[in-house]
Amino acid sequence: MVVGAFPMAKLLYLGIRQVSKPLANRIKEAARRSEFFKTYICLPPAQLYHWVEMRAKMRLMGFNAETIKPLNEEAAAELGAELLGEATIFLVACGCLVLEYSRQKTQQRRKEGEQLAAWDAMRDEVDHLALVLEALQAQVQAAPPPGALEELQAQMREVRAQLCVQDLPPAPQEEPTPRDEGPPDPGLGQD
């Protein structure tokens, strides 16, 4: 993934450079035309850049340069305009990076806000469910125990049975028949 990011970064840099190039060119032209701009804005950075560059080159080659001849005004103005153009491109690129960073931060804050809202909603739901659970537990504890319930059901059956017995009309009693009075006579009815 990192390897794929480098060409994209280079392409992004080239795109920003192309977009800011016209702006840099206009600034360069203004610097060349205006004496104030040339004298106070372009020349000092150009001379400083030339001095640092020459000093570094001399030290790398092993020479000890005590004085460095400054650039002539025309070369310094040209170098200053180029530096100003490159600085403009750099500032535009930095501005793009800052804008992208702030956009990502804003997006991250929004996402975190959504996550916090979802968390709060879940926490509220859990709190609500805890209250419902407590209410249900209170109802279960208030209900009679299962043994008492079975006992009440048995009592209800007994009461119903008693009510059913009382509601039935009394059954007529049968009168005893002669056959029922004693053992049957073996001789009777054998003629």
Curated annotation (Swiss-Prot):
The keyword Ion transport does not apply. One of its GO terms (cellular component) is mitochondrion. Residues 163-191 are annotated as: Disordered. Keywords: Coiled coil, Mitochondrion. Its main location: mitochondrion. It is found in: Mitochondrion. The keyword Endoplasmic reticulum does not apply. GO terms for biological process: regulation of lipid metabolic process; visual perception. Residues 120-143 form a coiled coil. It comes from the Eukaryota. It holds the Pfam family OPA3. Belongs to the OPA3 family. May play some role in mitochondrial processes. This is Optic atrophy 3 protein homolog. It comes from Bos taurus (Bovine). The lineage of its organism: Eukaryota, Metazoa, Chordata, Craniata, Vertebrata.
